[in-house]
Amino acid sequence: MAIADGKVSLKHLVTMETLTNEEVLGMIRRGGDFKNGRADFQLDRQYFAANLFFENSTRTHKSFEVAEKKLGLDVIEFDAGTSSVNKGETLYDTILTMSALGVDICVVRHSEVDYYKQLIDSRTIQTSIVNGGDGSGQHPSQCLLDLMTIYEEFGTFGNLKICIAGDITHSRVAKSNMRILKRLGAQIYFAGPTEWYSSEFDVYGQHVAIDDVIEDLNVLMLLRVQHERHRNDKGFSKEEYHTLYGLTEERYAKLADQAIIMHPAPVNRDVEIADSLVEAPKARIVTQMQNGVFVRMAIIEAILNGKA
């Protein structure tokens, strides 16, 4: 990875740890250029992209597709439900096939944490891998769009007070964000059920009661309760969770005037956040979705720069 002439160049994007601070800032600023119509971009040849999603997705899948088409790439359709995966084909062999067919970029979401390691270590696979989410591992493109949204609002990360609230243990979004936000100088708090928190996160921030910090926050980053990963847990009722840990209208009223609310979506309304607040003045949930297209354009451009 490198930056030349102000442009980020990547072979793969699988975790946030592989990016320098300069590369992170370069890509979120480039996302801003695409958003504001300032980006000068032209393909030097025909490129192919395939989006291989083995877990459900709306925003990540479709925003990558929009980003790819905006940049002029040819997008190869892939449906896991009708692919040879159902005949027992492994993920490795599926990506090996895409590489052999000449696909330049594969965006992959898979339930296996670190699925990408064998792909990027392969001497045969030549396609670039973009991690669209690996189980409860990481989600780098979501992290970058979150960073872009925060940067648009505050112009910096240093000394911002950011609370990541909710199902932290199972959240790839939380794991990507906590690492890079800490490195960029933000002060991180965690809130939510202690059952969904691990002491391994203490190196990044402090677990607190949301009501103890809400008045001081710059950013409240809410996380979806991942019901599909809690099948064997006693859990909470929707009403209990919302009352104890969610953003109620009463908590919203305590936020500072310049504070913003974020959520990676899909939103469980009246669980993580009151239904009435999803599009409230402080909410940036729609902005996050919009920024997702532009920061993913920046990611794809960086991958293509690495192929130049």
From Swiss-Prot:
Reaction catalysed by this enzyme: carbamoyl phosphate + L-aspartate = N-carbamoyl-L-aspartate + phosphate + H(+)
Entry's family note: Belongs to the aspartate/ornithine carbamoyltransferase superfamily. ATCase family.
Pfam families: OTCace, OTCace_N
GO molecular function annotations of the record: amino acid binding; aspartate carbamoyltransferase activity
Pathway(s): Pyrimidine metabolism; UMP biosynthesis via de novo pathway; (S)-dihydroorotate from bicarbonate: step 2/3
Assembly and oligomerization: Heterododecamer (2C3:3R2) of six catalytic PyrB chains organized as two trimers (C3), and six regulatory PyrI chains organized as three dimers (R2).
The entry's keywords: Pyrimidine biosynthesis, Transferase
SUPFAM superfamilies the record matches: Aspartate/ornithine carbamoyltransferase
Function description: Catalyzes the condensation of carbamoyl phosphate and aspartate to form carbamoyl aspartate and inorganic phosphate, the committed step in the de novo pyrimidine nucleotide biosynthesis pathway.
Protein's name in the database: Aspartate carbamoyltransferase catalytic subunit
